[in-house]
Amino acid sequence: MTLQELRYLVALADHSHFGRAAQACHISQPTLSTQIRKLEEQLGVTLFERTNKSVHVTAAGREIVARARRILADTDAILDAGQRQSAPLAGHFRLGVIPTLGPYMLPWLVPALRREYPLLRLTVQEEVTSRLLESLTSHRLDAALVALPVSQAGLDSMALFDEPFWLAMPRGDKMAKGKAVTEEELHGQHLLLLTEGHCLRDQALAICGSLDAENAAEGDFRATSLETIRQMVATGMGRTLLPAMALGQPKDSAIVLRPLAGGLGRRIGLVWRHSYPGAGEIGLLAKLIASHLPRGVHRV
């Protein structure tokens, strides 16, 4: 049994499809199938239940896949520890980011990381918070950029910056005039929201403080991205809350933006496993982010 075979095993468990797993491993599908069958013969158990369209990890396979993840994570940690002795933030680093942050933060963060730490091999995973936390605890990620607070055993967090929300509405909307929007004005307002699972949706509903806002949004429109919602606002479908980094440049002339009174918004931070050996790397990443923050957000 080799480390490469364990990587094939984990890839197939993650993708639940021989073709996609083979592509991720940069090998042919027959080669992957042969390696998995060889591993099953060595272990004397069936690791995957195969169908015409997908594969599923068996009960026996789940424990073996979990152990394989830990072995691979420890192996990567050994390799990275050696590289860190000669250079900071070197080796493989797996970063997660929520979808309402990634499109607006990664375009400046990734180039900055490459300039400052050329030996870093960065892998980015964009997912909702619950899945990022699951990937952290299962050693598939090293750290994640999420909205705080996060309360989960075994995870540490560090606040980075506060990002205010803005009310976005079509030009001509009755709320389009004025300066900062108060909580009283927002209470019970109909907003266009993201689908369930996005933390920004929950934050918007908390600010509006009304089940009516949720019911109205569910009945009219649900989106999986802020950019889709922005376009719907521009066409006059309704209002939404946008984080500062998502306001867009140049500004859309069909959309009017008003800040929220009191700086209402979200706090963004890094989350990582308490047992993660590269705590110093987390600090370096946080420092780099703080030094490159765009206008409109406020360092904590």
Task: Annotate each PLM feature.
Residues 53, 83-102, 116-120, 162-164, ...:
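Interdomain hinge and pocket-entrance segments immediately C-terminal to HTH DNA-binding domains
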Residues 1-35, 49, 55, 64-65, ...:
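N-terminal short secondary-structure element
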Residues 105, 256-299:
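A late-sequence structural motif
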Residues 152-159, 163, 178, 185, ...:
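Beta-alpha-beta core module
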Residues 128-141, 146-147, 193, 197-256:
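Hydrophobic hinge/microswitch elements
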Residues 40-57, 62:
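A short LG(V/I)-centered, amphipathic sequence patch enriched
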Residues 183, 190-212, 278-287, 293-300:
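Secondary-structure junction motif
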Residues 85, 108-112, 116, 123, ...:
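Short beta-strand-centered segments that line the small-molecule binding cleft or hinge
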